[in-house]
C-alpha cells in the first residue's frame, strides 16, 4: 500500500484502489491514462484470492498489462502467468529467501504482452534516444520489457543485488518447496 499510495506519487504515478473481487469496479476504474492493472495473488493482510483470469481478461481488453505481486503466493503455490499475468513481481526477501537475511526482488516477464499495440508504452515501443535509438519492442521482441528494465532502469538507478545476496536468495530457493509445504500443512491445521 505504501509503495502505491505514498512512494510512487513522488514520481507522478497515481493509483486507483478498487475491490479486486468486484470485476465491474476493476473495469470502471480504468482511465485513458491507466498504464497497468496491478494486484496481489494473495492480498495482504486478508489473504484474499482474486480471480486472476477474469482480471487479466479485463486488463487485456483495454490493452493493459496485468502485473501480479506473487510475494505471498510464491512460485510454489501459484504461477500467475498461467492465469494471464504479463509481469510477476516478488519480494524475494520473504518466502523466496526465507531467512530474512537479504533484501531483493524479482521481476518475471511472460513475454506475451504486445507493448506496441496500445500506443501507451513509447519508452518500450518507440526508438529510445538514450539507448542509441533502439526500440526495445522491435529489438527484443517478447523480452522487450525485461530488456528495457535491464538496459535503462538498472543502468540509471543502480538497482542491483550484490553477488553474496544473490547467493543467499538462491540458497533460499533450495528449500522453498519444503518451507511452503510446512506453511500449508500448518495453515490446514489452524483452519
Where do the language-model regions lie?
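Conserved PLP-enzyme active-site core in the AAT-like
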Residues: 1-191
Amino acid at each position: 500500500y505504501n509503495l502505491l499510495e505514498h512512494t510512487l506519487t513522488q514520481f507522478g504515478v497515481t493509483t486507483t484502489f478498487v475491490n479486486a473481487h468486484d470485476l465491474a469496479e476493476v473495469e470502471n476504474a480504468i482511465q485513458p491514462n491507466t498504464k497497468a492493472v496491478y494486484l496481489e495473488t494473495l492480498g495482504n493482510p486478508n489473504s484474499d484470492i482474486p480471480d486472476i483470469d477474469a482480471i487479466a481478461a479485463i486488463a487485456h481488453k483495454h490493452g493493459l498489462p496485468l502485473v501480479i505481486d506473487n510475494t505471498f503466493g510464491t512460485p510454489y503455490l501459484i504461477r500467475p502467468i498461467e492465469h494471464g499475468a504479463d509481469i510477476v513481481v516478488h519480494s524475494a526477501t520473504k518466502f523466496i529467501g526465507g531467512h530474512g537475511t537479504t533484501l531483493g526482488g524479482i521481476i518475471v516477464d511472460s513475454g506475451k504482452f504486445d507493448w506496441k499495440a496500445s500506443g501507451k508504452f513509447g519508452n518500450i515501443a518507440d526508438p529510445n534516444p538514450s539507448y542509441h535509438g533502439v526500440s526495445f519492442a522491435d529489438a527484443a521482441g517478447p523480452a522487450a520489457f525485461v530488456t528495457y528494465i535491464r538496459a535503462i532502469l538498472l543502468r540509471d538507478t543502480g538497482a542491483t543485488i550484490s553477488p553474496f545476496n544473490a547467493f543467499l536468495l538462491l540458497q533460499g530457493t533450495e528449500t522453498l518447496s519444503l518451507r511452503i509445504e510446512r506453511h500449508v500443512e500448518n495453515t490446514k491445521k489452524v483452519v
